[in-house]
Amino acid sequence: SLWFFDKNKRAENRDKVLFIDARNYYTVVDRTLNEWTEWQLRNLQAIVHLYRGETEKYQALLNDYRQVLGDITVASAQATLDKQKTEAKEAIANASRKDKKRIEAEMKAIEDALEDTLETARQYEWLTEKFGEGEYKDVLGLCKIATIQEIEEKNYSLTPGAYVGVAEAEDDGVDFHERMSEIHAELKRLNEEANVLMGEILKGW
């Protein structure tokens, strides 16, 4: 849980409380660990800034995004990453045995950097799609400004989900069957490579 205490509330925020439900806004680290990235934490804080009328702080965050991204969008970052992955596979496939590990490491470093850029673009898009250039609004499933009367009607519950509601499920644009086919193809390729490697190892005995 995140708590933001406001000792100097604006008059229009008297007897009101901002609730943010960030349960569905996180980055998966592994099967048992989720976390907020730096950009995600700053986005959550930006919602608080807008609630408090601190639009200059929201604008400062947008400027930070734009300095990092320039003209890069989610679409262009994804296209660049996909192109790099294709080129990396070709480079690794054509590399000599001696150079393969070095090229794999170089390609991975490039892909990691592109992944970071793509994630930054996604967080910028997430923020601006909801709040544009800096105007607070209640967002279903994410945030809501509730009055003391509304809180009283809910028996003074301080659970954000009781106020923000449930957002509609978003279509991530990924075709499940197509993705499963890709995974099976990748597993088949890895299995074939493992068999070849095992054959080479056995030859040395």
Which residues fall in each region the model found?
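A conserved structural/catalytic subdomain of Rossmann-like adenosyl-cofactor enzymes
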Residues: 1-204
